[in-house]
Amino acid sequence: AFYRAAKKADSDLSQYADVDSCAKLWLINELGKNWDSGVSSVYFVYKQDSDGNYKFFGSPVWDYDNALGNAAGSAWDLQNFGVKDYTQYSGWWCRFKDRQKRSQNSSNIINNISRNTQVNKAAVNI
């Protein structure tokens, strides 16, 4: 249910997840240009919130060996390590450059969460 809700920009993600922690997880991975984020190196913790409801929480970030400018390739293209062009990244940079279609990877949970209306509203307040 959480994954299906994350795939819809207008879904009520707060039923399944702590929106603030999802927004923080998205922002720190986007700002850190974490290449692995959302595909293989992201964790969510399932625990009780302050109201006693069980929800998914964005967990601490990890696996930053390919982040912060250390990788510029795609998939397993190991010959493209080292940043050559910061504009090739997806997420906020593509939206800033009005090229959102490049970030439409439906298997990337962080890309899905980044398009959620609730997460975008929460991100402004962080």
Q: Which functions belong to the PLM regions below?
A:
Residues A1-S103, S107, K121-V124:
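Conserved kinase catalytic-core segment
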Residues I113-K121:
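C-terminal substrate/ligand-recognition segments
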